[in-house]
């Protein structure tokens, strides 16, 4: 994955001087008079959740001295088909498809396609009335029922492909309402995973978490009207330029005092342990299973530069957990996963940089100029992109996952 310095990015984006956004409702750009009323646009994503957006709109018309979008309508006017009634219904939560783009003049990126879900007007005692409209990625419509399920010895794309075939035990209907398309080339390069569990999750939320874990994307691909029998489907796989509103697969390099506006890391040893033991039961032999993973194992390379500090803090020697595992290999892999998850929580950070539409949850970022303990490679868990009165900024939360920690 290429590493991009923000000075090079600045040249491509004309110095980040002209941020721009675009809102389309049912395929049409919002009218210019509505566009001028948009005070702020925000997009949020999280590596475990469906992404969302928020618009803050001026809700006062000084020419008529009345509310513009919410607050002046009548039950009768809402049933009419006039320009005024259409404006009153413009931001109603419903099935209208909304496309949000953000970026810079000449280079806008699709952040999401979604639906309005919430209207929140503000009628203050002083100051201008505003309307805040929130929405979710169109994928939220696929949240139907939560399931518990598990796969053994499968690749992520195989899991996605199989999920599309599963049926609900009570209704007999397919659990997932759309066919799922995977990338066969990506499948051939994926590692086989011994055990993956869906734990009381919506299928779409489970798929999103698996996709972001691998740096993949998920999107709804509309039916091709030129192809007979073509149908709407869900794509699970790597971003492909020209096929989807894709993002560049890049790692940004951000340096304190140059490209980082602020950076607030937290280092904690409170919940760290030296080893994890997983107990299970071998159904074939009828014997108990016990496997252990330790930080002394050579495979634990993330944040290894902090292990010396951890040893001085005398972390708990061990945690023992009972897990639904049935082979020694499953128990070993589960112990490794638990210990690795603990290890990743040692250093977390929140930060702000200039607006970067390609900086998303599930991607990596290199932090430099903050010393040996806090410089390094971070995995982004959440981002918030905002275009408003202060220009375009991207705020993100991340956890340090440095391989050796050589950066300073």
Region roles according to the model:
Residues 1-93, 131-140, 305-408:
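Juxtamembrane "anchor/assembly" segments of surface/extracellular structural proteins
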Residues 2, 29-34, 68, 143-152, ...:
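Surface-exposed, non-catalytic interaction/assembly patches
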Residues 64, 69-178, 195-196:
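Surface-exposed cap/loop segments at beta↔alpha junctions
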Residues 113, 157-161, 204-207, 275, ...:
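Extracytoplasmic/secreted envelope proteins and their assembly/folding machinery
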Residues 116, 278, 380-382:
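Conserved hydrophobic positions within beta-strands
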Residues 118-125, 283, 384-390:
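Short, conserved beta-turn/loop elements at beta-strand boundaries and strand-helix junctions
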Residues 127-255:
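Charged- and aromatic-enriched interaction segments used to assemble
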